[in-house]
């Protein structure tokens, strides 16, 4: 009965058991596939109480519940209300799903625990990174000599990070402060270090040498020079003291550098120790995971064993249920068999009545023909046939009208949908035009803004940017190094997450494989059920046809007997038969309606299956769907199996359509068509069995060959599809009842030749042969050929004129009869001795003998063709003679038949023709001997064949033999996995390439920057060169002027020297005169009164002359008129000396000032600022919140599962984590606060406007604003 009528609460009756009950459950169950109905019986004759295998479906008393199929129930009373049928059990969980859920819960628990451990490791990594940065920043910066005017100038870049002194580097407070400063430094406020200055030796003071022949003015100048040298020595001592202080500071810096190197070495050692600890932790983690996996595998094995035991118990219960169902089914079938036997007996009685009536009719018709009377009109039987045809035509007309109305309705519906789609398209086009207009406006606005931005950026700003870019890049390098360290930590966390996800993926794949296996089992059961349903439908169709025929005969009998009312009244059994016929007809009509509904449902299933296949093929790559690919290979296998199935249909329908002939007489040959139809059936079956032989071998080969051979076979799909149309044509002829003896078999012969050639071409390199199936097909083909040849020989016997028994044609026909009978007996014997198991492949025969049997079938096919052509031409000749001469006999001379047979042998055998007798006798003698050998071998080796087949099947089950389709599928899966791996590798390579491109771009930018610097340096060099040339010209002019003045002074000096020389000469002459006078005075001995005043002068003169004659000459030789000139010259020399000394001191001071300005300014430690500390702590919290927002994953499944979770881990997991949007807004606000604080502390870094202050370009780049 229909499953739609079965609802909970309905009253039903169990067919065949006379039990009443109430429906309590309708739906799917876990103990068997399909829909079951739970019935609460009125009597305690059930089998359960509503529960099976620990699962409660409904409640009732003990032994009052029973589960049956919907087809075993008959509805007595519908449900009182519209209660919904229970489609699935929601309160109980099947035991089969418990291991899977346990495995999922354990995997999820391990995943959550691994994530918690990863969060802890991530916190440790961030802490270590902050400590690393703190240790690097805790080293005190180098001190440098600040210039004297440092109060008026400000340093171009300062660091916000405060270095702790080296002496206090061990206490905890300093390390905590340094870690805070290090976390604050990570934002990019770094100071760019300048190269240190190593002062050179001080310049020596120039030496000044006096000429040896200078006068008193030179002595004064020497004194001044000594005085200046003393001053210079004092300055030199001051500078040496400063140099010593600088050297002392540099020595202190070197000691600090040594301490820094020591700390760096310790840091590297700690890093190595940390890596070793991390490696040991990773190995321990892996061992822990391995141990967990082993424990999980053991638990799964235990659960699987328990599940298997539960499945065994379920199977036992199912077997008992199936046994009971089989017993019930056997009872019903026994009842149906008895009713069918009674019906057959009744129909046999009716058939005998009809035969007697037809014989009487035939005798009356023969009497009318012999009497020369005209044939009467249409009989009642023919009239009834015409009425039935009219009724069928009317029904067809009504169906066509319904179909046309349905098509019109569909066309109107599609037209309405088309109009709706057009209106939607117009609306979308309007929306597109509006959006395109908006896009154009926005692009114009963007272009204007871009032009404004380009106009705002000037050349000077670009030069400044390029000049300062190196400093910014150094800052960025430091930032990037810190980011790289953080990313390496994140990479480690990511690798651990990937490992945990990989384990989860393996678990899910195992579950997916189990689900796919269950799905395949369900599909196999569904296919078996569909095959069973199809076989039953075929049987029902045959019975319906038989019932229809018998109904027609009964209606005819009813019409004939209606005229005789008295006899009908006297025979009450006929009335009973009529009533039963009417009841059966009504039952057949109801069955026909049910069949129509089933056909519609199957049509829906077929359309959905086709759509499913189309959707699945849409996911396949182009290589799968390409010509000669895997898709074509699958289609080839399906095509060959489909052609084999169609051949079976042709065989069965042809045997039913053309029954065998009881006796072949001359009247049956010349006046009827039954003999020719039977011969045609035999030939057709021979070719169909030959086609099946080739197809079976190709199908076996394609299921056992290499994948390359299968792909090669896929390329021949179009040719095979064309050959399939030949078989489809034969089936169409069978459907239209147009297949008869006049139909040609040339196409099927070409099809057989094509597939034999394809078998030899495709499977030539591989020895793949299904021997048993080939023998079975060849036996069927030989049997049909023998039947055809025997029918042709029988026709030849009755149409050849009787003559002597020694003629060639008669002898050949007798020989053919005897040998064909022998071959047919041998074929039947081989067929009986073949194993019934279809999975048996090997027969123990050599390949040469098996191929010889196929050749034997082909050779007998040639004999069959020759005999058929000769018989056909003979009948045509007889018909032509009858048409020309009605009095001629329906026979043919032996000589003419022999000539026709010889001509047909020449056409068929061509070059191998040796005459009919020779052709047939040699072949049939060899055929008998070969078939006897094969039959004897099958009889002797029957046990060996079966045992070898069993061994092969066991080996096949244990060896996991896979078909080429499975191998190709596994290969494609591996290729997809490799493709995914390659895609991941390619993505990594692309990321590396992008990084390299970024690095190359940075290098290109640096190169362009260096090029610009080079151009600027060349420009400055050219400017300096011009200035130098201009200065050289100036100095040349000054040199020439000075040289002219020197020449003039030399001339004046020479003149003065000449004048002085004349004065000296005059003084010498005067001196000599005075000496002469002095001598004269001494000789006279007279001393004058004024001589005492002059004597000291003379003494001093003599002393002077004795000590330093040169000086006395210079001192006392000058007259009174030359003293102003000498004093003026001395004054000029003093002025020149003072100017030169001042210029030299000024240049030395400038040089020292320039050298001191190149030194790095000393860092003055500032007291701790509360605002900076607050900003650092806020920044640290922001970083931790951002990292937690990236790694926090809340797993609801793990919470719902029954695993134990630590309270602290649960509290941390349930701790609220802010969203990324909130963190981003807070981060932007914090950045603006930091920038504001920085600009307040460093106002020179800001550009002041009328309304606000903005950071400069370098600050923007450092902060990445």
Curated annotation (Swiss-Prot):
Q: Where is this region: Disordered?
A: 81-179, 1082-1106
Matches recorded under SUPFAM superfamilies:
Cap-Gly domain
Subcellular localization, as worded in the UniProt entry: Cytoplasm; Cytoplasm, Cytoskeleton
GO BP term, pick one:
mitotic cell cycle
Its main subcellular localisation, reduced to a broad class, is: cytoplasm
Domain of life of the organism in this record? Eukaryota
Task: Please list the coiled coil stretches.
Answer: 213-570, 812-836, 967-1084, 1128-1160
Where is composition skewed (Low complexity) in this entry?
103-138, 161-177
Return the GO cellular component terms, semicolon-separated: aster; axon; axon cytoplasm; centrosome; cytoplasm; dynactin complex; dynein complex; kinetochore
- Give UniProt keywords alphabetically: Coiled coil, Cytoplasm, Cytoskeleton, Dynein, Microtubule, Phosphoprotein
Signal peptide residues are none
What SMART domains does UniProt report for this protein, alphabetically? CAP_GLY
Q: Where is the CAP-Gly domain?
A: 27-69
Q: Does the keyword Flavoprotein apply?
A: no
Record keywords: Coiled coil included? yes
Q: Write down which residues bear the modification named Phosphoserine.
A: 85, 110, 114, 117, 121, 183, 1117
GO molecular function terms listed in the Swiss-Prot or TrEMBL record: dynein complex binding; dynein intermediate chain binding; microtubule binding
Annotated family = Belongs to the dynactin 150 kDa subunit family.
User: What subunit structure does UniProt give?
Assistant: Monomer and homodimer. Subunit of dynactin, a multiprotein complex part of a tripartite complex with dynein and a adapter, such as BICDL1, BICD2 or HOOK3. The dynactin complex is built around ACTR1A/ACTB filament and consists of an actin-related filament composed of a shoulder domain, a pointed end and a barbed end. Its length is defined by its flexible shoulder domain. The soulder is composed of 2 DCTN1 subunits, 4 DCTN2 and 2 DCTN3. DCTN1/p150(glued) binds directly to microtubules and to cytoplasmic dynein.
Q: What does this protein do?
A: Part of the dynactin complex that activates the molecular motor dynein for ultra-processive transport along microtubules. Plays a key role in dynein-mediated retrograde transport of vesicles and organelles along microtubules by recruiting and tethering dynein to microtubules. Binds to both dynein and microtubules providing a link between specific cargos, microtubules and dynein.
Name-wise, this protein is Dynactin subunit 1
Species classification: Eukaryota, Metazoa, Ecdysozoa, Arthropoda, Hexapoda
């Amino acid at each position: 009965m229909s499953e739609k009528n079965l609802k909970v609460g309905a009253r039903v009756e169990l067919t065949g058991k006379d039990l009443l009950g109430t429906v309590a459950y309708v739906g799917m169950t876990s103990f068997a596939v399909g829909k079951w109905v739970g019935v609460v019986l009125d009597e305690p004759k059930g089998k359960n109480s509503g529960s099976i295998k620990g699962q409660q479906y409904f409640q009732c008393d003990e032994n009052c519940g029973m589960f049956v199929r919907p087809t075993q129930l008959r509805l007595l009373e519908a449900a009182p209300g519209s209660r919904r049928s229970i489609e699935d059990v929601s309160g109980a969980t099947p035991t089969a799903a418990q291991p899977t859920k346990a495995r999922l819960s354990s995997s999820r628990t391990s995943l959550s625990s691994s994530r918690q451990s990863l969060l802890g490791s991530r916190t440790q990594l961030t802490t270590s990174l902050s400590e690393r940065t703190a240790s690097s920043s805790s080293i005190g910066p180098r001190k440098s000599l600040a210039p004297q005017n440092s109060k008026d100038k400000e340093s171009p870049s300062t660091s916000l990070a405060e270095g702790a002194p080296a002496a206090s580097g061990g206490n905890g407070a300093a390390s905590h402060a340094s870690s805070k400063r290090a976390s604050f430094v990570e934002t990019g406020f770094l100071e760019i270090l300048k190269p240190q200055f190593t002062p050179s030796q001080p310049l020596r003071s120039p030496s000044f040498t006096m000429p040896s022949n200078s006068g008193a003015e030179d002595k004064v100048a020497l004194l001044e020079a000594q005085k200046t040298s003393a001053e210079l020595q004092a300055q030199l001592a001051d500078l040496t003291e400063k140099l010593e202080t600088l050297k002392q500071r540099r020595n202190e810096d070197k000691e600090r550098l040594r301490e820094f190197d020591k700390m760096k070495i310790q840091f590297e050692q700690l890093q190595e120790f940390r890596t070793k600890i991390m490696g040991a932790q990773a190995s321990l983690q892996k061992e822990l995971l391995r141990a967990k996996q082993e424990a999980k595998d053991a638990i799964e094995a235990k659960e699987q064993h328990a599940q298997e035991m539960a499945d065994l118990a379920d199977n036992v219960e199912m077997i008992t249920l199936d046994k009971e169902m089989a017993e019930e089914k056997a009872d019903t079938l026994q009842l149906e068999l008895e009713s069918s036997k009674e019906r057959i007996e009744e129909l046999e009685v009716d058939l005998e009545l009809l035969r007697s009536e037809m014989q009487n009719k035939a005798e009356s018709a023969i009497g009318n023909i012999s009497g020369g009377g005209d044939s009467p009109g249409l009989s009642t039987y023919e009239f009834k046939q015409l009425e039935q045809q009219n009724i069928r035509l009317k029904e067809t007309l009504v169906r066509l009208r319904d179909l046309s109305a349905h098509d019109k309705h569909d066309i109107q519906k599609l037209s309405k949908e088309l109009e709706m789609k057009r209106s939607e398209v117009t609306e979308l086009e309007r929306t597109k035009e509006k959006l395109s207009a908006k896009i154009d406006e926005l692009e114009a606005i963007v272009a204007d803004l871009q032009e404004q931005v380009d106009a705002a950026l000037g050349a000077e700003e670009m030069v400044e940017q390029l000049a300062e870019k190196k400093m910014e890049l150094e800052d960025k390098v430091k930032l990037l190094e810190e980011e790289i360290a953080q990313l390496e930590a994140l990479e480690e966390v990511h690798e651990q997450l990937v490992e945990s996800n990989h384990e989860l993926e393996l678990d899910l794949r195992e579950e997916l494989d189990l689900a796919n296996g269950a799905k395949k089992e369900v599909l196999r059961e569904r296919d078996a059920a569909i095959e069973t349903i199809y076989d039953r439908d075929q049987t029902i169709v045959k019975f319906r046809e038989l019932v229809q025929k018998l109904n027609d005969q009964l209606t005819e009998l009813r019409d004939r007997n209606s005229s005789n009312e008295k006899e009908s009244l006297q025979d009450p059994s006929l009335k009973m038969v009529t009533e039963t016929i009417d009841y059966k007809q009504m039952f057949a009509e109801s069955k026909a309606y049910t069949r129509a509904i089933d056909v519609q449902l199957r049509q829906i299933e077929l359309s959905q299956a086709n759509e499913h296949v189309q959707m699945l093929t849409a996911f396949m790559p182009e290589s799968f769907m390409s010509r000669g690919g895997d898709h074509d290979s699958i289609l080839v296998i399906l095509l060959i199996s489909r052609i084999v199935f169609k051949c079976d249909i042709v065989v069965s329908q042809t045997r039913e359509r053309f029954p065998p002939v009881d006796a072949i007489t001359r009247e049956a040959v010349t006046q009827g068509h039954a003999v020719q139809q039977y011969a045609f059936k035999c030939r057709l079956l021979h070719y169909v069995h030959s086609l099946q032989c080739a197809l079976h071998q190709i199908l076996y080969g394609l299921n056992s060959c290499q994948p390359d051979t299968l792909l090669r076979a896929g390329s021949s799909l179009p040719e095979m599809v064309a050959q399939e149309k030949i078989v489809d044509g034969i089936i169409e002829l069978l459907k239209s009842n147009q297949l008869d003896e006049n139909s040609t078999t040339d196409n099927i012969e070409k099809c057989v030749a094509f597939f034999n050639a394809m078998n030899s071409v495709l499977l030539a390199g591989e020895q793949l042969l299904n021997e048993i199936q080939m023998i079975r097909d060849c036996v069927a083909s030989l049997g049909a050929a023998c039947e055809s040849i025997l029918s042709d020989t029988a026709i030849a016997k009755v149409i050849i004129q009787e003559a002597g028994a020694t003629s060639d044609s008669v002898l050949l026909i007798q020989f053919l009869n005897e040998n064909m009978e022998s071959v047919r007996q041998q074929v039947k014997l081989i067929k009986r001795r073949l194993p019934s198991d279809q999975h048996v492949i090997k027969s123990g025969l050599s390949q040469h003998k098996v191929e010889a049997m196929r050749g034997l079938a082909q050779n007998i096919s040639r004999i069959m063709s020759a005999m058929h052509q000769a018989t056909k031409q003979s009948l045509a000749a007889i018909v032509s003679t009858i048409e020309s001469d009605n009095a001629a006999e329906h026979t043919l001379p032996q000589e003419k038949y022999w000539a026709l047979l010889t001509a047909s042998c020449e056409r068929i055998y061509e070059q191998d023709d040796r005459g009919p007798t020779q052709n047939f006798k040699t072949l049939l003698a060899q055929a008998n001997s070969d078939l006897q050998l094969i039959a004897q071998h099958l009889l002797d080796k029957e046990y060996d064949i079966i045992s070898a087949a069993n061994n092969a099947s066991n080996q096949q089950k244990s060896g996991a033999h896979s078909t080429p389709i499975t191998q190709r599928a596994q290969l494609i899966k591996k290729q997809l996995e490799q493709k995914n791996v390659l895609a991941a590798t390619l993505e990594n390579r692309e990321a590396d390439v992008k990084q390299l491109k970024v690095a190359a771009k940075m290098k290109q930018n640096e190169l362009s920057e260096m090029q610009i610097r080079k151009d600027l340096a060349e420009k400055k060099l050219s400017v300096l060169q011009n200035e130098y040339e201009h200065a050289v010209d100036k100095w040349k002019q000054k040199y020439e002027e000075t040289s002219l003045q020197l020449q003039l002074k030399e001339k004046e000096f020479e003149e003065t020297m000449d004048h002085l020389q004349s004065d000296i000469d005059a003084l010498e002459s005067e001196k000599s005169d005075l000496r002469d006078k002095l001598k004269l005075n001494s000789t006279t001995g007279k001393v004058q009164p004024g001589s005492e005043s002059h004597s000291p002068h003379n003494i001093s003169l003599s002393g002077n002359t004795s000590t330093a004659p040169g000086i006395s000459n210079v001192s006392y030789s000058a007259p009174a008129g030359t003293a102003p000139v000498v004093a003026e010259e001395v004054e000029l020399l003093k002025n020149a000396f003072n100017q030169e000394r001042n210029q030299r001191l000024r240049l030395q001071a400038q040089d020292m000032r320039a050298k001191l300005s190149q030194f790095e300014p000393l860092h003055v430690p500032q007291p701790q600022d509360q605002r900076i500390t607050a900003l650092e702590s806020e920044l640290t919290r922001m970083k931790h919140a951002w990292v937690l927002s990236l790694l926090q994953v809340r797993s609801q499944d793990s919470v719902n599962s029954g695993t134990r979770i630590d309270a602290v881990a649960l509290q941390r997991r349930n701790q609220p984590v802010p969203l990324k949007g909130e963190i981003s807004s807070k981060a932007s606000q914090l950045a603006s606060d930091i920038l504001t604080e920085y600009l307040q502390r460093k106002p020179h870094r800001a550009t002041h406007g009328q309304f606000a202050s903005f950071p400069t370009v370098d600050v923007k780049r450092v902060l990445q604003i």
